[in-house]
Amino acid sequence: MTMPLADLTVVEVSSFVAAPLCGLTLSQLGAEVIRVDPIGGASDVRRWPLAASGTSIYWTGLNKGKRSATIDLRSPEGQELIRRLIVEGDGVVVTNAAGLSWLSFEQLATTRADVIHVQLLGRGDGSTGVDYTVNAATGFPLVTGPANQAGPINHVLPAWDVCCGLYAALAVVAAVRRRDQSGVGAKISIALEDVALATAGNLGWLLSLIHI
């Protein structure tokens, strides 16, 4: 059976949860996803929990089914190789790497106008934020935990990373469809904080808390 994204190649320059989950989701839909890591591995390559062999179960779970490329991201030659993987491939990149001007939409669009660039952020203004800090900032710890506990309790599920990764995968699918129809690329930014606030609004949890 032909998978929905069987003819699509996606380059993923990422680490941790949201962006790798986006790539994993696209891979499970049939896309060829190339996970790019720096030499020695990204900061999540040995993240707990570890198997007896020392391999990160976490990393393996989020990157199964992908191709892997280890490239020197600091060298001009390595940066050019990654750009070529993107622009000479299907022109789709997903990243949560910040501050890499050579990997920006603007830079890639100079050689491929219809590039689809998806950037995952902590916060919409570009400042840092991870799942548990965003969760605390949005007020969700006030509505999680035991009913008899008055104080805020953070949950253990990286919910906003997961939601953000799935939203990002949907954004790629939508952008590819639009490009197929119009030839237009896309610059897409998705922030964990925005995802959390949008989800809170949709579920009405924080409003319910006010009424309580």
For every predicted segment, state its role.
Residues 1-181, 210:
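N-terminal helix-loop segment corresponding to the beta1-alpha1 unit
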Residues 176-209:
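Substrate-binding/catalytic subdomain of NAD(P)-dependent oxidoreductase enzymes
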